[in-house]
Regions:
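Catalytic alpha-helical scaffold of carbohydrate-active enzymes acting on polysaccharides/glycoconjugates
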Residues: 1-136, 141-186, 212-233, 239-288
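Surface-exposed cleft-lining segments at the edges of enzyme active sites
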Residues: 134, 197-209, 237-238
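Glycine-rich, positively charged active-site loop/lid region within alpha/beta enzyme cores that binds
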Residues: 182-203
Length: 288
C-alpha cells in the first residue's frame, strides 16, 4: 500500500527543475523471448536482440561517458552470465547494476518462492560482477507480482522502477521503505522502435528518431515546468543503440541539461527522496 508520496513540492538538488533518469534495460534476446512467448521466434529476431551486446551497448556507454553520466542498467541474471564481459564493462564504467529478473520471465502469477529464488540467483551473479549489493528492481515487461513490493522489502531493496501511477517518486511504506520511481510507456523506446516478425501484435515499423525526440522534449518541458517531477526514460541498447537514435538521445540530454535537469542514477535519486522525506535506507537491510 502507498501511504506516503513526496510529489507535493519536493526540491531537487542545486535548484534543478526536474530529476531525469536515463535507465537501460540490458536484456538482449531475452526481451524477445518474453514478448513472443517464443512463438515462431527465428534467428532473425534473436539476432535483433543480440544487437544490444554486439553493437548498441558500446554506443550507449560511449555516449554516457561523453556526457559524464552515471546511471542504472537493469540486467537479467541470465544475460549477465551469457554476456559477462559486456556487463563487466557496464560496472567498470561506474554504472549501477539492478535486478531485472533471472531469465526475463514475465509470467503473471509466478509463485513467491520461485520468484525469491530467481532474485537470489540473479543478485548473486550481478553482485559478483559489480562487488556491490543489488538495491534496485524493475519487473520484466513491467509484470510486478502482487507480492513484489513485500518481497523487495524483505530482501532489503532500496527502490522499484516499474509502476506507472504518477509523475513523481513516492515511497512504499513498511519496516523497510522502498521508493517507487515510476516509468511510462511513452518514455520507453520499446514503444517506438521495437520490431518483430514473430508476433502480429508488436510494432512492425519504427518511428523516426526526430519524432521521438520531439515527443520526449515536449514531455520534459511540461514536467520541468511543474517543478517536482521525475522523467524516467526506459531504454534498451538493442533499440536506442542504433546510430541515429543514440545521436538523438545525446541531443536530448544536452537540451535537458541546458534547461534545468538533474540527471542521475536510480539509487542516487531514491536515496535523495528518502532523505527529503526524513527517512534513511535501512543500512543493515541494504548491506545484506
Amino acid at each position: 500500500m502507498i501511504t506516503l508520496k513526496n510529489g507535493d513540492g519536493i526540491k531537487w538538488p542545486h535548484g534543478k527543475r526536474i530529476a531525469v533518469l536515463l535507465t537501460f534495460d540490458f536484456d538482449a534476446e531475452y526481451l524477445r523471448y518474453s514478448v513472443t512467448g517464443q512463438r515462431a521466434l527465428g534467428f532473425s529476431d534473436i539476432s535483433r536482440g543480440q544487437y544490444g551486446p554486439h553493437e548498441g551497448l558500446k554506443r550507449c556507454l560511449d555516449m554516457l561517458a561523453r556526457q559524464n553520466i552515471k546511471t542504472t542498467f537493469f540486467v537479467p541474471g541470465i544475460v549477465a552470465e551469457k554476456y559477462a564481459d559486456e556487463v563487466k564493462q557496464i560496472a567498470a564504467a561506474g554504472h549501477e547494476l539492478a535486478y531485472h529478473g533471472y531469465a526475463h520471465d514475465a509470467r503473471p502469477g509466478i509463485p513467491e518462492a520461485e520468484e525469491e529464488a530467481n532474485m537470489a540467483k540473479a543478485e548473486a551473479i550481478l553482485e559478483a560482477i559489480s562487488g556491490k549489493k543489488v538495491v534496485g528492481h524493475r519487473a520484466p515487461l513491467d509484470t510486478l507480482q502482487t507480492y513484489g513490493v513485500k518481497l523487495m522489502q524483505k530482501r532489503g531493496y532500496l527502490y522499484s522502477s516499474t509502476l506507472k501511477d504518477c509523475d513523481w517518486a513516492y515511497i512504499h511504506e513498511g519496516e523497510h521503505p522502498v521508493v517507487e520511481l515510476p516509468t511510462e510507456p511513452g518514455f520507453d523506446d520499446f514503444s517506438f522502435f521495437y520490431f518483430s516478425y514473430a508476433d502480429a501484435h508488436t510494432i512492425t515499423c519504427s518511428y523516426p528518431a526526430e519524432y521521438v525526440y520531439n515527443m520526449w522534449k515536449d514531455a520534459f518541458d511540461e514536467l520541468a515546468n511543474e517543478g517536482d517531477k521525475i522523467m524516467c526514460l526506459k531504454l534498451h541498447p538493442q533499440l536506442i543503440g542504433r546510430s541515429s537514435r543514440i545521436r538523438m538521445l545525446e541531443r536530448l540530454v544536452l537540451y535537458m541539461r541546458q534547461n534545468g535537469a538533474w540527471i542521475a542514477g536510480c539509487e542516487e535519486v531514491a536515496r535523495y527522496v528518502l532523505a527529503q522525506n526524513g527517512k534513511e535506507a535501512d543500512a543493515d537491510a541494504v548491506a545484506k
